[in-house]
Amino acid sequence: REVVFFTLGTTDLTQYTIAVDRVNNRVANMFRPTHPAVIRIMDMTITAGERENIPTAICGEMAGDITLLPLLIGLGATSMSVGVHLVPIIRYAIRNLDYGQCRDMAQKALQAPNSRFIVDLSTALARKSYPALFE
């Protein structure tokens, strides 16, 4: 109603949600953009946008990570903002994903107990969908 699009900056979202500064050597190893709290916030934002026909773009490091694309697409993200050098790779990956499989996997990820489980789910679907990018 008030906006025409949402953009989720995943790096800042992660940093502020789980209170971990990725450049602080003492805590940088705890920086996890797939932390269940981060994924749930992303889902709530995207779902709110969908209810009002507001598209949600993803920017930040997650958008260019081919292992996490199935998760982002499954959550309902409508576009990825990546560096120009990644555009062909991300486009290829997205074209090879099955939306239904991504949605099913994302629903499992939303119930996940930890970041590793979420990464494993998304990576498995990515490897199945575009194996050539992992060679």
Task: Kindly give the residue locations of the regions a language model identified.
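Non-catalytic helical/linker scaffolds that mediate oligomerization, partner binding
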Residues: 1-135
